[in-house]
């Protein structure tokens, strides 16, 4: 599915933007702080209904405005359709061909976007929360129903934590069932996705780093020893058992200490934890391999590559990895949006149909390439 046109109003620092992107590569040029990343976030928000950098919708609305709007025309196998999302401090409304959508299945049909930003380079050396976030965003792209499943889990988790802090045993017990059922679904999704991604991560890392590189391993480790290699019903039973074992500790501390919100992704090179033992170059190669694995997995599952959003990544990679990334993008039949402060970093991947835009002070204008 290709993005044919984009309209943005009162989103971050973007007052009003209309963009006709290239079917292949659209490059956004400008200094830092001018709105390049905001434009990428607008596209990401349109395709996922999730912001890139904040959990608060109010921060997405331009200062002084009441609401923001992002809309786009997409061309896919079923023809052209218009999707839009209105955002306000109190919430958001998704629209498909002008009609508000309560159920989002039709809205998300065919939409998938993978974003690669400098913060992603912290996936290896950062804490487990970032790795869980990566996996859950990738799972959402693979199975959009994950969005609703994650919300069910978060609701049950917050309610149980409140009951633990409030000293309400009966209320706490009433939320244990919904929590373990929703948690088991999340564990199953993560497990299935890691099984799909793991061999692709290993292959991509070897291609990036060369045949002499150590073997990259990507594995899922649920919290508290809950084994993921079972069916969903047994997963729920094991989660419930783990909760029962930790009940007194959870009551003392006022929060749930086991479940998908505490799980970990293991990244290792030749069996040694990458966070502690990998060099900076190896860590960045691993992150690049993770992103390429996600892209290739979606390409295989959907029959087409996802929309690609790359935020000033070339400036964060060494020349060898940047050449690999640009060569990969040039060979991939995908629509891509790239931001940079230095046009020379992107030029090797530019083709005759690459569109260049200048972004300055929240204004976007086309450049003659």
From Swiss-Prot:
Annotated residues for binding of ATP: 30-37
InterPro entries found in the cross-reference section: DNA-binding_RecF, DNA-binding_RecF_CS, P-loop_NTPase, RecF/RecN/SMC_N, RecF_2
Principal place of residence: cytoplasm
Signal sequence annotation: none
Record GO biological process: DNA replication; DNA synthesis involved in DNA repair; double-strand break repair; SOS response
Molecular function as annotated in GO: ATP binding; single-stranded DNA binding
Domain of life: Bacteria
Biological function: The RecF protein is involved in DNA metabolism; it is required for DNA replication and normal SOS inducibility. RecF binds preferentially to single-stranded, linear DNA. It also seems to bind ATP.
UniProt family annotation: Belongs to the RecF family.
Protein name listed in UniProt: DNA replication and repair protein RecF
